[in-house]
A protein has these predicted regions:
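Short acidic, glycine/proline-rich loop/turn micro-motifs
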Residues: 17-20, 155-158, 302-304
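Phosphate-binding site of ATP-dependent enzymes
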Residues: 166-260, 283-288
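Hydrophobic beta-strand scaffold residues
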Residues: 44, 94-95, 123, 144, ...
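Alpha-helix N-cap recognition
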Residues: 51, 164-165, 314
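Active-site nucleotide/adenylate-binding loops and adjacent lid/helix of ATP-dependent enzymes
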Residues: 2-10, 27, 59-61, 104-185, ...
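ATP-binding N-terminal substructure of ATP-dependent carboxylate-amine bond-forming enzymes
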Residues: 1-96, 100-101, 105-107, 111, ...
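ATP-dependent carboxylate activation and anion-phosphoryl transfer catalytic cores
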Residues: 115-120, 249-333
Length: 333
């Protein structure tokens, strides 16, 4: 590959989303990626997308062969992530990762489920409600998970997200409506193992070996869910007791089902270059897709990168492969 001038766009370091995943790390993912690209001979510079009008002007004047897009929203609004990608398109910028259509489909968890149902990918039964209006509903049994329909990174999903009664459900809905101005997703709770599968590629996409978040040692009485406490609150017992591992006891038919669901979902949701899919595997080996994550975290300890390593790739090789995939997409137009 020719040496490129690459703009690394990212949310500000002071952003809580960035600070959460920096816990215990010396560098941000933007810094790690810049080092990889520079060692490969590329020139890099950073562009902070912080929601201020001047950052839009800065993007409009960017002189780069490619944008390595790490932006997670616009200002403090996660739901504006697709808008940033759309702005790149308007400016004619070439960039890594999913475009506005794929980002929008994956961000709306209810819409994701409807699309995947058409493609026969199993997801938990669900309902959506917004300020008293029921928009969609299956017949769901308790317990249920109650979460924002358009947030990611476990935002809005604490241990209290698990509701076992009408009273708990209504209290949880009220809390989320107070915090987020969009519908609430009520989802059948799937008791089982938490499995993450990365996908890399485009027309010839590849699924990585699965990575498991072992929740079996959470404090007694806490629900076995990947809550914000488990993922981000570093000083808590819940955070310390949840460990990532490579499962070696999944049956071949389960591995095949996970791989098929991940690759089918990647194409159905029109994702590009790389993504991560979150699954639940029940004790009777049923596979449920819980969430699609386009443009997942790429720091060296992230779930996606762990899966890449299990596939035989190093962290630098994975970053450079994502870069090459984006380059190839634009060359083939």
């Amino acid at each position: 590959m020719a040496r490129l001038r690459i703009a690394i766009t990212h949310s500000p370091d002071g952003d809580p989303r960035v600070q959460r995943r920096r816990a215990g790390l010396r560098k941000t993912d933007a810094q790690e990626i810049a080092e990889v690209l520079r060692r490969a001979g590329h020139k890099t510079f950073f562009v902070v997308v912080d929601g201020a009008p001047k950052c839009l002007k800065r993007l409009a004047s960017v002189d780069a062969d490619l944008v390595f897009n790490l932006v997670e929203g616009f200002g403090d609004d996660n739901t504006k992530e697709p808008h940033v990608a759309a702005y790149y398109d308007l400016l004619g910028l070439r960039y890594t990762g999913s475009g506005p259509r794929g980002l929008s489909l994956a961000m709306d968890k209810a819409l994701t489920k409807k699309v995947l149902a058409f493609h026969r990918v199993r997801t938990p039964k669900f309902a959506t409600v917004f300020r008293g209006r029921l928009d969609w509903a299956h017949d769901i049994d308790f317990p249920v998970i109650v979460k924002p329909v358009r947030e990611d990174g476990s935002i809005g999903i604490g241990f209290s997200a698990l509701a076992g009664s009408i009273k708990e459900l209504m209290e949880r809905i009220d809390e989320l409506h107070a915090d987020f101005n969009h519908p609430v997703l009520i989802e059948q709770y799937i008791d089982g193992r938490e499995i993450y599968v990365g996908v890399i590629g485009n027309a010839r996409a590849e699924a990585f070996p699965p990575v498991e978040l072992d929740l079996s040692h959470l404090p007694k009485g806490k629900p076995r869910i990947a809550s914000v406490e488990v993922k981000w609150e570093e000083g808590t017992r819940a955070y310390r007791s949840a460990k990532l591992r490579f499962p070696d006891d999944l049956r071949r038919e389960v591995l095949d089902a996970i791989r098929h669901a991940a690759l089918t979902s990647f194409q159905a949701l029109q994702l590009r270059d790389y993504a991560r899919f979150d699954f639940r595997i029940t004790p009777d080996n049923k596979v449920y897709l819980i969430e699609a994550n386009p443009n997942p975290y790429l720091y060296s300890g992230a779930e996606f990168i762990r899966g890449a390593r299990a596939s035989g790739r190093t962290h630098p090789e994975t970053i450079l492969e994502i870069l090459e995939l984006a380059e190839e997409r634009y060359r083939s137009r």
